[in-house]
């Protein structure tokens, strides 16, 4: 007995019903996944590495760490013009505050030194006496002095965010 095509055609069992829940579009799932993934990655960067791994980068070769900066010096006394032009970028002559701190440390090692250091004077000739940390400007700065070059190091914005977050959470 031959079968007719109409006997095997698809016939729904009941009237069509809409789906019970609406589905989120694929782009929304990608967006949500990206946001959650980003939060997880930032949390891992903040929580997993130790505090030491977020330290300042080391000073360049020939430079020495001093507080948040790096210093380099020439042991030969020189005139102001020569001292100002001798620091390679991004370094400049050491700022007065850092020079006073360095003088306090240096006085411990050589209390009898009477040398002078050129310091950054915002375009004017300025120097600092090593023995007592007294500075002089213009007319008092005729003699040669030592050049100490200095460049500051500061952590980037993300490193500051990480360390402040770790501090807020009480992490070591």
Curated annotation (Swiss-Prot):
Keywords: Membrane, Signal-anchor, Transmembrane, Transmembrane helix, Viral envelope protein, Virion. One of its GO terms (cellular component) is virion membrane. This is Envelope protein UL45. Residues 49-172 are virion surface. It is found in: Virion membrane. Residues 1-27 are intravirion. The chain crosses the membrane at residues 28-48. Coiled coil: none annotated. Belongs to the herpesviridae HHV-1 UL45 family. Important virulence factor of HSV neurotropism. Seems to be required for glycoprotein B-induced fusion. Dispensable for growth in vitro. InterPro entries: Herpes_UL45. It is a single-pass type II membrane protein. It comes from Human herpesvirus 1 (strain KOS).
């Amino acid at each position: 007995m031959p079968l007719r095509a109409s006997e095997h055609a698809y016939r729904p069992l009941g009237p069509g019903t809409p789906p019970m829940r609406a589905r989120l579009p694929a782009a929304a799932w990608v967006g949500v996944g990206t946001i959650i993934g980003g939060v997880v990655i930032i949390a891992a960067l903040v929580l997993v590495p130790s505090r030491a791994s977020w330290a300042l980068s080391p000073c360049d070769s020939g430079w020495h760490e001093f507080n948040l900066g790096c210093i380099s010096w020439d042991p030969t006394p020189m005139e102001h013009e020569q001292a100002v032009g001798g620091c390679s970028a991004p370094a400049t002559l050491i700022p007065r505050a850092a020079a006073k701190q360095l003088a306090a440390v240096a006085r411990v090692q050589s209390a009898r030194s009477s040398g002078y250091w050129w310091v950054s004077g915002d375009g004017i000739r300025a120097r600092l006496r090593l023995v007592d940390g007294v500075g002089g400007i213009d007319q008092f700065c005729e003699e040669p002095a030592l050049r100490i070059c200095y460049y500051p190091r500061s952590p980037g914005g993300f490193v500051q965010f990480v360390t402040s977050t770790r501090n807020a959470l009480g992490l070591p």
